[in-house]
Amino acid sequence: MRSISVLGATGSVGESAFDLLMGAGGPERFRTVALTGGANVARLAQMARALRAELAVTAWPERLADLRAALAGSGIEAAAGPQAVAEAAARPADWTLSAIVGAAGLPPGLEVLNRGGTLALANKETLVAAGPLVMARARETGARILPVDSEHSAIFQALHGENLDSVEHVTITASGGAFRDWPLERLARATVAEASRHPNWDMGQRITIDSASMFNKALEVIEAHEFFGLGVDRLRVLVHPQSIIHAMVTHRDGGSIAHLGAPDMRHAIGYALNWPARAALPVPALDLAALGSLTFAQPDEVRWPALRLAREAIGAGGAAGAVLNAAKEQALDDFIAGRIRFTDMAPAVEHALALAAREAGFAQSPRDLGEVLHWDDFARRAAAQWQGAA
């Protein structure tokens, strides 16, 4: 029986994974080693009971008593806190999904790699903040990383059997998010509620707002650079409102291989779960005739300056990815809390990058988790101080 763990089980990606696991046989087919989640301990306990997990962990220490109460009589072990999440990731499992949102996903992701496990990676921040460290650790231990972001899963599939040297460039598509068609002058007045409505994908609030600002795509460009080893000159972004083509690989002979699929995370999760095989998934096949047409446009970097910042971070190298990621998280926190405007997020991130570039050691890629966390803390403080946000 295959053993699995899901980190971030109660988020949108975790819910999709749970749906797939239960549909594929649940505890009759999988031995669930550990599930981790956040504040929603009632849902975490419900999932743990359904999958007969050995361990359930909430990242919130103050919710441990509630989790234990929800698991009473089940025989499932309960734990709490970030260290407990990392320890859960360190437990041997054949396949571990990392779906924790933000930089909090890095320590448990490294624990999976340290034990040489298979890491199905939906947490893009792991590679953005610590790409060289993460990829080196995987090589050292023989661990395998399978991309679960829909775009990177699409690239991974389109590259199957291909020589990377023959690739001219890779195109990642973007829906354009909630404000794709808004007049530029209106963006400064955008509310959190408006930014939280995605036209195509059903996702959590933070990633939906990141989609509206295009910071989600900026992180994905950096992630593709780190995972596939592609230079910034071989990475492109196209606005594709229908979210049907997730990525395209264009070869030097002029031909392109695209991956098409419904905007449903269950496809990428299911592909990673069953790789290298393919299995039937509860995702409807595309009806291209019903779709009628697919449209594309070049992204406007005045509207979406995050894309420029991603290219600059790749060019700078060193700690730039860690700084961009943490500054973005802080700016997003400040926007959600009403401390800054939607259009202030990119300037706050750019401010943090400019300050970090003056610091000793910025040009050096983080060599361990401690160095990643140093730059994470620096960037959050710098972004929070931008124009008085604190």
Curated annotation (Swiss-Prot):
1-deoxy-D-xylulose 5-phosphate binds at residues 124, 150-151, 175, 198, 211, 216-217, 220. Its cofactor is Mg(2+); Mn(2+). NADPH binds at residues 10-13, 38, 40, 123, 125, 204. One of its GO terms (molecular function) is manganese ion binding. GO terms for biological process: isopentenyl diphosphate biosynthetic process, methylerythritol 4-phosphate pathway involved in terpenoid biosynthetic process. It catalyses: 2-C-methyl-D-erythritol 4-phosphate + NADP(+) = 1-deoxy-D-xylulose 5-phosphate + NADPH + H(+). It is an enzyme of class 1 (oxidoreductase). It holds the Pfam family DXP_reductoisom. Keywords: Isoprene biosynthesis, Manganese, Metal-binding, NADP, Oxidoreductase. Gene3D superfamilies: 1.10.1740.10, NAD(P)-binding Rossmann-like Domain (3.40.50.720). Mn(2+) binds at residues 149, 151, 220. Its EC number is 1.1.1.267. The keyword Cytoplasm does not apply. Catalyzes the NADPH-dependent rearrangement and reduction of 1-deoxy-D-xylulose-5-phosphate (DXP) to 2-C-methyl-D-erythritol 4-phosphate (MEP). Belongs to the DXR family. This is 1-deoxy-D-xylulose 5-phosphate reductoisomerase. It comes from Paracoccus denitrificans (strain Pd 1222).
